[in-house]
């Protein structure tokens, strides 16, 4: 079993939608797959199942640990299938929503990741959260190229140096919508 690290993946983003709308995109499976994944199962109560399949090959799954409507969602996270060294439920994702004017400030903390999985998950959230912001604000985030990642590509990405993953992630973020650079 991989050893968890004390380092955190932390992200923050402002979304031009009220917390109630953002919360729906975090907890309604039909809305969730509009910004992340090919399929999702989410039982929005403590102990309920949390499962999202970003690529169509290796679902991430865990349990809902805490849920406060329109304010907070905490769930365990890990990958089924063994392609990544993070079994289901081994790490924890905490999402806090705060009103910010007419929008929402979303703060995400992903903890208990093995050291070799920080960059991978950091880039994953760097990719997914802007897509959430677009769809929650009523926009179309466009096609999701992550859905076309093969299992072998997923395994190979694990071994890339963090600086390469960072550059790759920044390039994808800059070109994610309508051809205009997004920074």
Give the ranges of each region predicted by the language model:
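Hydrophobic ligand-binding cavity/cleft-lining segments
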Residues: 1-39, 158-163, 170-176, 183
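Beta-strand/loop substructures that line and gate deep hydrophobic ligand-binding cavities in soluble
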Residues: 8, 82-129, 143-144, 162
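Short, highly charged C-terminal tails/helix-capping segments
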Residues: 134-174
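Hydrophobic/aromatic beta-strand elements that line small-molecule binding cavities or substrate pockets
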Residues: 13, 61-66, 91-98
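Short beta-edge strand/loop motif at the mouth of beta-sheet-based domains
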Residues: 10-11, 17, 21, 30-63, ...
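Hydrophobic pocket/interface hotspot
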Residues: 22, 32, 50, 64, ...
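A short, structured loop/turn motif at beta-sheet edges
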Residues: 19-20, 65-71, 96-105
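Short, solvent-exposed secondary-structure boundary/capping segments
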Residues: 71-78
